[in-house]
């Protein structure tokens, strides 16, 4: 209708024409109460040069299809077509100093992560938006801004709004797709120094971390081994704790190596374990018990339980809606009463009473109170609906039932304040009304209702933090996680066993326990009977040689045939190596027992019975004559003379081996298995006077691992287990240069071959090597009699020796020259194969000072290697990462 000047109203007429090809604009009524407004800034705070930042609206994807003009916030015209424009949520605040938060419900529904953006107009603004599937690209939206009509808001802006934040009531309203509108957060104008910006960024919520299972690198048919692809589902296998790979009996040691973090593949070392297998940590399988000895199994299981990589990741545990930091998890696990069977998940924790439970469930344990972990407890933490609160948490019906039966007055929906000792009072009052768990009947009631009661450790903690045995073990393991491992290897007879025992005596307060000494006593006494048997075998040989020599001389002197001479000399069969009938019978019986392999079964149990015969045998002149020629008995070891000279005392029932006896004893350490020793070097007098901060080196822990030579042979079955050792100590017996093995090969050449196989193995490529040339005292004695050129590798040893040799006049001895020659030989051989430097030390394994010096040299090498790595890292961080910044 045409508008007349005197009309005060407008009327619309009904359209009855042809159908329209476009959408008809609709008039949307305005709810004035829901129009977002902002308070007028005080004129005092406004300067002439100050301009306000402009909020750029974020539109949906559908709205990008239309070209939209600037629309006033109070406009009533909206497009009501199929692609309807959706206004930003009514809860948006347009004040430059306000904060518009994106609620947790919207984030969880959209499933997006927060993204920080920065807008700058005249002042700096921090914009945090939620990246949802249907959000508009920020760059595109900023290029087509929708500038709001600020003039149309003048009618509603007033000084009647004292607050700078006005929020509508439609936060939970959804859009046409049933999804909530994304809300933008403005964190205000940053200060000049940027402090507010940094503080706001640091307060952003942490992203929830979801455990992701690592997949195995290879996988065969179902039920087969993941390495050799053999076997079936019925074949016994060992399972990796990380990727679930399964290995058979033949492949488990090669696939898992030395297991520095337990039963993990070598490629899985450093990864967290599968949480479904946490219950099997430290529980050894039958397969490992068959493959390894008890000491190795115990060490692997201990490492598996307490190593840092296998501990529960802190970010997987949520307490009162917040993920834990590593320090908080350690605090939680090391308290006097920690949560039992802690697994990844959401938990609630009442810090006042110590009540602990899973999110949305009733409490199942009372842990130590007042722990600074997680956030504040939520009223809906246990999903209660009783209108009764304990320390700000609405309790469940089961808890309410327990309180009512315990005599607590719960009428009127009270709010209780409960302490760790069970005392309770209403909020706002000081009078204690009673103790919830004070009666024995209440504890029985809690047991029936499956509710927790305070433990004795919680009641007696008195604010002091105590440590459980398991938590203490975790801390101890984390404290010593920098354990330096030293691998001790050498050929058979090189002296690795003696060095290992010497280290045990030097660095352990109690090197051998009582039962160990009793077992060593049996070994020593059995060895002495074996040495006597070797002497008796040599006596028979010497006796036969003496008789043959006598007959030959007699036949030559009398000029008669040898056969007739033997017949005439039957009565003259007594030589200096002959023994009486009684000792002869004992000798024959002992040799038969040795040949049958029953020496360890009969002796030393029968020592008391045969002690008189042994004493008589040792004092016999024939045995003494044989003992003087002991160097001609190839099977008799050099340490035999130490025990044979004390045979009468050693074979007594009340014999107790000394530390020196144990050092000389053979067979004390296993020749077929690993032997480990954890130790630390004691502080010297000079170190005790140093500053306490300089004691770090002496307090470091080391692990000496002795490996048998047969395990490092051609197949090298043990080498793959030692990829985490710090260095390798290779021991060489210098007195073996003239010895030969059973197949006739020189022992020094066999040692060289073993040394080559180890230094060229890829496992030891980046490790330092210390060569200990052992038995220096035996070398000095032997080299005077047997030339070093007896070994074909040392045929070029031609020293210039002075007539007046000796250490007194400053000239090196022949033994010193031989040692230096061997050291140079091994150094050149090592350098030719690896291109690196070999550290060399001489040693007398029976001398404690000599062994101590060699092992301390190993410590210094490890220390220097660590410092060298730190220096390289510091240089790397100081200079640019460009290739031109480095020089070769």
Swiss-Prot record:
Major localization listed first in the record, in broad terms: nucleus
Subcellular location per the Swiss-Prot or TrEMBL entry: Nucleus
Observed effect of gene inactivation: No visible phenotype.
Keyword Transcription regulation: no
Region spans: G5 motif: 843-848
Tissue expression as described in the entry: Ubiquitous. Strongly expressed in vascular tissues, root and shoot meristems and lateral root primordia.
Region (G3 motif): 702-711
One Pfam family in the UniProt entry: G-alpha
Biased composition, class Acidic residues, residue ranges: 103-118
Residue ranges of domain G-alpha in the record: 482-879
Record has Mitochondrion as a keyword: no
Region G4 motif: start-end pairs: 770-777
Source organism superkingdom: Eukaryota
Region (Disordered): 98-119
Span of zinc fingers (RING-type): 225-268
Region (G2 motif) location: 661-669
Protein family per UniProt: Belongs to the G-alpha family. XLG subfamily.
Annotated domain remarks: The helical domain (514-664) is required for self-activation.
Name of the featured protein: Extra-large guanine nucleotide-binding protein 1
């Amino acid at each position: 209708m045409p508008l007349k000047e005197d009309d005060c109203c407008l009327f619309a007429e009904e359209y009855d024409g042809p159908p329209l090809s476009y959408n008809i604009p609709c008039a949307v009524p305005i709810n004035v109460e829901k129009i977002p407004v902002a308070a007028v800034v005080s004129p005092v705070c406004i300067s002439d040069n100050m301009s306000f930042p402009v909020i750029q609206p974020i539109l949906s994807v559908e709205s990008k299809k239309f070209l939209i003009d600037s629309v006033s916030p109070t406009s009533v015209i909206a497009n009501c077509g199929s692609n309807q424009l959706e206004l930003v949520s009514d809860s948006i605040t347009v004040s430059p100093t306000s904060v518009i938060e994106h609620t947790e419900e919207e984030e969880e529904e959209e499933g997006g992560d927060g993204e920080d953006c920065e807008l700058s107009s005249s002042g700096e603004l921090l914009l945090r938006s939620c990246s949802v599937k249907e959000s508009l690209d920020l760059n595109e939206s900023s290029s087509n801004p929708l500038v709001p009509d600020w003039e149309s808001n003048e009618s509603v802006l007033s000084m009647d709004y004292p607050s700078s934040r006005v929020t509508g009531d439609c936060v939970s309203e959804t859009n046409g797709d049933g999804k909530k509108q994304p809300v933008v957060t403005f964190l205000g104008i940053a200060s000049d120094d940027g402090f507010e910006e940094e503080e706001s960024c640091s307060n952003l919520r942490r992203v929830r971390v979801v455990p992701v299972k690592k997949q195995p690198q290879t996988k065969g048919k179902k039920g087969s081994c993941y390495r050799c692809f053999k076997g079936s589902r019925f074949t016994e296998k060992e399972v990796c704790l990380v990727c679930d790979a399964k290995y058979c009996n033949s492949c488990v040691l090669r696939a898992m190596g030395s297991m520095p973090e337990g039963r993990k593949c070598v490629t899985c070392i450093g990864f967290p374990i599968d949480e479904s297998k946490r219950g099997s940590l430290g529980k050894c399988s039958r397969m490992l018990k068959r493959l390894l000895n008890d000491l190795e199994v115990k060490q692997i299981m201990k490492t598996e339980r307490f190593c840092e990589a296998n501990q529960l990741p802190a970010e997987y545990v949520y307490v009162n809606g917040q993920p834990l930091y590593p320090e908080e998890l350690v605090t939680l696990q090391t308290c006097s009463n920690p949560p039992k069977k802690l697994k990844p998940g959401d938990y609630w924790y009442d810090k006042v009473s110590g009540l602990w439970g899973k999110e949305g469930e009733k409490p199942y344990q009372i842990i130590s109170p007042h722990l600074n972990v997680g956030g504040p407890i939520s009223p809906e933490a246990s999903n209660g609906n009783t209108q009764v609160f304990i320390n700000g948490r609405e309790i469940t019906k089961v808890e309410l039932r327990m309180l009512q039966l315990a005599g607590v007055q719960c009428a009127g929906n009270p709010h209780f304040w409960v302490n760790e000792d069970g005392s309770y009072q209403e909020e706002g009052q000081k009078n204690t009304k009673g103790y919830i768990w004070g009666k024995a009947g209440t504890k029985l009631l809690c047991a029936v209702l499956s509710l927790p009661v305070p433990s004795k450790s919680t009641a007696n903690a008195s604010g002091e933090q105590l440590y459980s045995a398991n938590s203490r073990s975790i801390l101890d393991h984390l404290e010593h996680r920098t354990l330096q491992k030293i691998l001790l290897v050498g050929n058979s007879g090189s002296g690795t066993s003696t060095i290992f025992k010497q280290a045990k005596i030097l660095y352990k307060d109690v090197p051998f326990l009582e039962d160990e000494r009793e077992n060593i006593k049996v070994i020593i006494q059995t060895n002495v009977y074996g040495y006597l048997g070797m002497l008796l075998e040599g006596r028979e040989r010497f006796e036969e040689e003496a008789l043959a020599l006598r007959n030959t001389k007699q036949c030559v002197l009398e000029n008669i045939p040898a056969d007739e001479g033997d017949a005439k000399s039957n009565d003259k069969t007594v030589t200096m190596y002959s023994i009486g009938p009684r000792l002869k019978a004992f000798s024959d019986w002992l040799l038969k027992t040795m040949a049958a392999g029953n020496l360890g079964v009969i002796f030393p149990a029968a020592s008391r019975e045969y002690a008189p015969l042994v004493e008589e045998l040792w004092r016999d002149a024939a045995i003494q004559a044989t003992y003087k020629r002991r160097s001609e008995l190839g099977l008799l070891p050099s340490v035999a003379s130490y025990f044979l000279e004390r045979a009468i005392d050693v074979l007594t029932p009340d014999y107790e081996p000394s530390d020196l006896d144990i050092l000389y004893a053979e067979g004390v350490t296993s020749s077929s298995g690993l032997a480990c020793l954890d130790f630390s070097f004691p502080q010297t007098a000079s170190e005790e006077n140093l500053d306490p901060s300089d004691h770090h080196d002496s307090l470091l822990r080391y692990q000496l691992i002795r490996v048998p030579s047969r395990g490092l042979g051609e197949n090298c079955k043990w080498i793959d287990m030692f990829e985490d050792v710090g260095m390798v100590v290779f021991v060489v017996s210098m007195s073996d240069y003239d010895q030969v093995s059973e197949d006739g090969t020189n022992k020094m050449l066999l040692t060289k071959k073993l040394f080559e196989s180890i230094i060229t193995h890829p496992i030891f490529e980046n490790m330092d090597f210390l060569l200990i040339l052992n038995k220096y005292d035996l070398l000095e004695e032997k080299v005077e009699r047997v030339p070093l050129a007896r070994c074909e590798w040392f045929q070029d040893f031609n020293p210039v020796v002075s007539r007046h040799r000796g250490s007194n006049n400053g000239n090196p001895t022949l033994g010193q020259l031989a040692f230096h020659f061997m050291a140079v030989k091994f150094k050149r051989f090592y350098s030719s194969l690896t291109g690196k430097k070999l550290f060399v030390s001489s040693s007398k394994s029976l001398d404690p000072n000599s062994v101590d010096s060699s092992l301390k040299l190993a410590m210094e090498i490890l220390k220097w290697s660590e410092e060298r790595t730190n220096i390289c890292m510091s240089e790397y961080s100081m200079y640019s990462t460009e290739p031109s910044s480095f020089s070769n």
